[in-house]
Amino acid sequence: MRAVLQRVTQAHVSVDEEIVGAIGPGLMVLLGVEQGDGPQDAAQLAKKTAELRVFEDAEGKMNRSVEDIGGQLLVVSQFTLAADCRKGRRPGFSRAAAADTANSLYLDYIEQLRQRGLTVATGRFQAMMQVHLVNDGPVTFLLDSHKVF
């Protein structure tokens, strides 16, 4: 399971020109589920997302988590994070999990965050979405439950 975390001052996601999820300060999360991922990957990544210290403290050091600041999260599924671009000019998606598995683990990840008391807005699974965000920094991190990077 892979995630792109972006520290934002605000973000929202639209489907068919209708806003379906919006947040204030916090994290924008693009989440991709790969074949072989399971509930343990969702739990591990949710814990890391909630606890990663990417917000500045009074001294300007990244020493506070989204939990610490009472921030919000906007989680959007993105199967293209499982793309293999090593050969040719067209990405391959054979590593992406099947839609039913991916949706289940996407929802599990979101539920894990909500169980921690975090406010989580979402996109719509398998929909064509437009994501709008204001990067803060910019500060962006790549997470992988298999620790590839």
From Swiss-Prot:
The Gene Ontology terms for molecular function here are: D-tyrosyl-tRNA(Tyr) deacylase activity; Gly-tRNA(Ala) deacylase activity; Ser(Gly)-tRNA(Ala) hydrolase activity; tRNA binding
- Which biological processes are named by the entry's GO terms? D-amino acid catabolic process
List the ranges annotated as motif Gly-cisPro motif, important for rejection of L-amino acids: 137-138
> What residue range is the signal peptide?
none
Q: Which GO terms describe its cellular component?
A: cytoplasm
SUPFAM superfamilies this protein is in?
DTD-like
Q: Does the keyword Transmembrane helix apply?
A: no
Q: Where in the cell is it found?
A: Cytoplasm
In the UniProt record, does the keyword Iron-sulfur occur? no
What's its catalytic activity? glycyl-tRNA(Ala) + H2O = tRNA(Ala) + glycine + H(+); a D-aminoacyl-tRNA + H2O = a tRNA + a D-alpha-amino acid + H(+)
**CDD domains recorded:** Dtyr_deacylase
Uppermost EC category = hydrolase
Q: Identify the EC number(s).
A: 3.1.1.96
* Entry keywords, A to Z: Cytoplasm, Hydrolase, RNA-binding, tRNA-binding
Mainly resides where?
A: cytoplasm
NCBIfam families attached here?
D-aminoacyl-tRNA deacylase
Question: What family does the database annotate?
Answer: Belongs to the DTD family.
Q: Which PANTHER family match?
A: D-AMINOACYL-TRNA DEACYLASE 1, D-TYROSYL-TRNA TYR DEACYLASE
Q: How does it assemble?
A: Homodimer.
Written domain comment of the UniProt record: A Gly-cisPro motif from one monomer fits into the active site of the other monomer to allow specific chiral rejection of L-amino acids.
Q: What does this protein do?
A: An aminoacyl-tRNA editing enzyme that deacylates mischarged D-aminoacyl-tRNAs. Also deacylates mischarged glycyl-tRNA(Ala), protecting cells against glycine mischarging by AlaRS. Acts via tRNA-based rather than protein-based catalysis; rejects L-amino acids rather than detecting D-amino acids in the active site. By recycling D-aminoacyl-tRNA to D-amino acids and free tRNA molecules, this enzyme counteracts the toxicity associated with the formation of D-aminoacyl-tRNA entities in vivo and helps enforce protein L-homochirality.
* Record protein name field: D-aminoacyl-tRNA deacylase
Q: Organism, per UniProt? A: Syntrophotalea carbinolica (strain DSM 2380 / NBRC 103641 / GraBd1)
- State the organism's lineage: Bacteria, Pseudomonadati, Thermodesulfobacteriota, Desulfuromonadia, Desulfuromonadales
